[in-house]
A protein has these predicted regions:
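A generic structural signal for short, non-catalytic loop/turn and secondary-structure boundary residues
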Residues: 19-21, 89, 143, 166, ...
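A short, compositionally biased
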Residues: 9-11, 165-170
Length: 218
C-alpha cells in the first residue's frame, strides 16, 4: 500500500474543508490573499505554511483538529504571532489561524468577560472600554490575549489587578482527541502557565473591573 506524503495529506485536508456544508475558510500559497493573511509581527519568509486554516467557531476548530489528528497532519496555532522563535508558522505544517474567534462577551453584573481564543489585546481593550471596563493587558495591542495571559501576562495593570495568568477563571479547550471540553480544575492549573501544552484554547473567562479613574499613579 502506498504511503501518504505530506502534500497528499494537505490536499486531502483542503478538500475536506471545501466539502463541508459551510466551507471552512483557508488559503494556500497560491491564494491571492495568502501573503496578507500570513503577515504578522515576525515576518520570516522562509516560514511559509502550505495551508492556513481560518475557523470561525470552536466547533470548526474541533472539526479541523480531529481531521488533522486522524490523518497525522502536523499543525501550529497562530493568533498574534508574536512568538520570538516564529513557532506560529512552519513550512512543513498547517497553520490554524484563530483570529476569527475574536468575540468578547461582557457580563456587567457578574464583572466577567468571555474572550474568544483569537482575540487580540486591542480588540479586548476596545470592547471593555465601550462598557467602561478594564482588564490586565500587555502594552502591545497586536498581541494575542490568551497566549499572553497563559504564559504569565505581564503588563501595566499587574500591580493593581495581578498577572494575566491570574485572570483565567475558566477555559474552553479543544483537546488531543479533537473534542471541545470545559477545563476542569487540573486542566485549569496546567493552562495557567503552560496552556499551549494542553490543547487549543478557544475561549477563556476573565474578571473585568470598572474603569473609575486613570492617572499616572495607577
Amino acid at each position: 500500500m502506498a504511503t501518504e506524503t505530506g502534500d497528499s495529506r494537505i490536499e486531502k485536508l483542503a478538500a475536506f474543508l471545501t466539502g463541508q456544508p459551510t466551507p471552512v475558510q483557508h488559503v494556500t500559497r497560491s491564494s491571492p490573499d495568502y501573503a496578507e493573511i500570513r503577515s504578522g509581527y515576525l515576518n520570516n519568509p522562509s516560514l511559509d505554511p502550505p495551508l492556513i486554516v481560518r475557523p470561525q467557531s470552536a466547533e470548526e476548530v474541533a472539526l479541523i483538529a480531529s481531521f488533522m489528528i486522524e490523518h497525522g497532519i502536523e499543525f501550529t496555532v497562530r493568533v498574534g504571532g508574536h512568538d520570538l522563535f516564529g513557532r506560529s508558522f512552519r513550512s512543513d505544517a498547517v497553520t490554524l489561524d484563530l483570529r476569527k474567534l475574536n468575540q468578547v462577551q461582557i457580563d456587567r453584573q457578574g464583572l466577567t468577560a468571555r474572550v474568544g481564543g483569537g482575540t487580540l489585546c486591542s480588540n479586548l481593550a476596545r470592547a471593555l472600554g465601550e462598557h467602561g471596563m478594564v482588564a490586565p493587558c500587555p502594552t502591545v495591542p497586536s498581541v494575542g490575549y490568551i497566549g499572553w495571559a497563559m504564559h504569565g501576562g505581564y503588563g501595566p495593570y499587574m500591580g493593581h489587578f495581578g498577572l494575566g495568568v491570574d485572570q483565567i477563571l475558566a477555559a474552553k479547550v479543544v483537546n488531543h482527541q479533537g473534542k471541545v471540553v470545559e477545563a476542569d480544575a487540573d486542566l485549569l492549573k496546567g493552562i495557567r502557565g503552560a496552556g499551549a501544552a494542553f490543547g487549543i484554547i478557544v475561549e477563556v473567562t476573565i474578571p473585568v473591573f470598572p474603569l473609575e479613574k486613570v492617572s499616572l499613579e495607577n
